[in-house]
Amino acid sequence: MAYHFLFAAPYGAEAGTEFLHRLLPLLDMFFMISGFFITTRYGGELRDVADYRGFLRRRIARLYPLHVIVTLFFVAVALLAMIAGADNYPWRQELEAMPLHLLAIHALGTTDHLALNFVSWSVSAEIFCYAAFPLIIVAMRWKGLPGLGLLTLGWIAALEMASQWGVFPSGHWTTADTMGAYRAFADFCIGACIAGVVARRALDIRSHLPGLALLAGALAAMIWQLPTYLVLALLAFSLSATALAETARPNSTAALRFAMPVTRVSFGIYLWHPVMEFLFLTVIWTRWLEPAGIVDFYVFWLLPMAATLAVAMLSDRYLEKRFGALIAGPRPRPACEARLASA
């Protein structure tokens, strides 16, 4: 959020965005965490096509409603710009991207530029990971953790070859966005490997200090711009150590429960912040407040940050769950409950 907001800053923007850009591998950590949780939760449950269909439907129901809502907001902006004849707004490019966004395939290489709901390439990438999840299931049931490791290494090797052949517009798979689905699945596979490590409990880690130390090392490596593979390895080791400590002592993070109202809407914060950026910074700040010089940017930007958080919490409560339930359909009954009903 701060990274994108800084582009509107009248001073400090170049230094601030350059510094925060170094932390972008944290997005890879998000996909690793997702791979870990999905594998832990569903790795033993998907046994046939019906299970997979239900899984995919429920996961899409979690992401798709808010993605569509935000996308349609920017479609409306593009239509208004077209009607107003705003030549400074790329409305034609935005409207051309609409079908790709609504189909959530804009991170699969169907376009070479970000448009409309630009941060939602990660939503497209996450849905791709869900669709490809059977590959992880097959590898896991074939050879367990070694099978997951082979899948991960094979996928990364293929991405590295594609990078050498110039397939990725960004130059390398680790910085891909319009083809970010393939990058995300590599991280997702790493998360699945972490799930395998934690399930085996090969190491008895009970303190969160090793995980925090490894995370600090990963952040330092990002800031110092050390090799990306080192950063990814440190992130993976950090998540592994943290997950081992958390599963060994489930109550060890009880003190952090106060932050749950915010952390549970992190997805909403991520998707809503471009809307707040447009309303508060592109419109209110750029058109009126900056020319008037009545408030400092770094005071004003607290308002769109607070608005993003508030809207994300309201959206989670009143929009996402209701629309998501329409897509997900009724939850499957437990097997024992189904047997009782049929008796």
Go through each PLM region and give its residues:
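Hydrophobic alpha-helical transmembrane segments of integral membrane proteins
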Residues: 61-62, 130-131, 187, 207
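Lipid-exposed faces of alpha-helical membrane segments in multi-pass integral membrane proteins
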Residues: 2, 32, 69-76, 99-102, ...
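Conserved beta-strand->loop/alpha-helix structural units within folded catalytic cores of enzymes
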Residues: 34, 64-68, 124-138, 322
